[in-house]
UniProtKB/Swiss-Prot annotation:
UniProt main location, coarse: cytoplasm
Keyword DNA repair in record: no
CDD domains: KH-II_NusA_arch_rpt2
Protein's recorded name: Probable transcription termination protein NusA
InterPro entries: KH_dom (IPR004087), KH_dom-like_a/b (IPR015946), KH_dom_NusA-like (IPR025249), KH_sf_prok-type (IPR009019), NusA_arc (IPR010212), NusA_bac (IPR030842)
Localization per record: Cytoplasm
Source organism (scientific name): Methanocaldococcus jannaschii (strain ATCC 43067 / DSM 2661 / JAL-1 / JCM 10045 / NBRC 100440)
Amino acid sequence: MAKVRLTTEEIMKIGFFEKIANVPILDCVLNDERVAFIVKEGDVGAAIGKGGENVKTAEEKFGKKVDIIEYSDDWRKFIRNIFAPIQLDDVWVKRVGKDVVAFIKINPKVRRAVFGEKGKNLERALKILKRHTKITKIKVIVENQKFKRKRAKRPVVKDQQQEQTETKQETDVQQDVKETVKE
C-alpha cells in the first residue's frame, strides 16, 4: 500500500464527515461530481446513517454525490465494494509482467455504469486501488452475448434449375428406396 497524500480539501471533507458520522475515515477520493469515503470493514452502515442521513447531510454540504466504500484486505472483495451496487460477474487479480492487474468480467448491460462518463468511474476505481493495494491496472472484460451468424454453405437464394435438379435427385433416391423395399 502506497502512502496516501491528502489535499487540504480532502482533509477538510474527511474532518466534516467524521464529525457527522462518528466513524473513522481511511481515505477520501474526489472528482468533479463525487466524493468517495473509504471506511473500515463493518463501518458502512454507521457511515451512511439512519435512512442515509449522514450521506444526505454531506451531499448538501459538498454539493456533490457522496459514496461510501468499505475497505477490505481481500482485494477482490475491495474491488466489488468500489463498484457496488453494480453486479460484477467475476473479479480476479493477476501479475502481468511488472504490473498487478485487476480483471473485471461484466455483463454488457452494466458496461456504461462500470466505465462511467468518459471513463471517470474506472479512473476513480484505479486511483483508489493504487492508494490501497499494489494493483496498477484494471482490465474490463465484457461478456459477448451476441452470437455471430455463420455463413450459409450454400447460397440462400436458389435458381430454378438448381431446385429442379435437387427435386429430381430426391425423387430418384425415393424410387431407389421403394424398389429395394419391394425386393
